[in-house]
Amino acid sequence: NRGVYGDYAIVKVPEGQLATAWEVNRTYVDTDVLVSLTKLKSHVSAGISGGLKNLFGIPPSSLYGDDLKDNPDERAVGYRNGTMHECNRAPLTSVRTFTGKGVPGDHGYNVPHFIVDLAAAFRVDLAVIDGISTIQTAEGWWNGSMVSLTRPGLLIAGRNPVCTDAVAAAVMGFDPDAADRTWPFVNGLNHLALARRRGLGENRIKNLEVGGVGIEAARFEYQPTFRRIGA
């Protein structure tokens, strides 16, 4: 949320599709380097969750959270389901920041577009994906028995989050340039391809230089989080 700062910063989104700006903690504009550190896992709305999807944590619950009513609240800690997944309510920002082009109820459309709008506004300098010990078939503890613990024993890092996430997807056994609404993006759009088309990085493995042990040696087959939205 706002933290020690007296106000929020407004960060514009170049060529924003669902968001024209983000109202966020001032740390994100005062910092010299932005590192996205996340776990290697699949995701029901985004297909995979890597350095890009990790940016979903930037918009503060105090303005975007589900536990808000009519006014911003610095005590809020809720998810952003209504504003950024369902698109059935606007955030309580000081200026209008959303375009209104989200599709109500369609996580698979809204989440990928918001991921790219976040990536366009907050340029990641280093993406680190922890696949040493992680989970698959679900996003987190809140999914209960759907979660499967797994130990790929991998650490994936890169200077561009689109490229890094593409390598992560390939290591997981997925095609990072797969068509929309196919594995692993079965419930929606391929946000890696959306990011490439916005000029944010490359998601086609043939165009990437990969160091370390290489994709084939590192491959650890994942099960996609295939639960249909609403099921």
Sequence positions of predicted segments:
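Extended, low-polarity segments enriched in aliphatic/aromatic residues
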Residues: 1-231
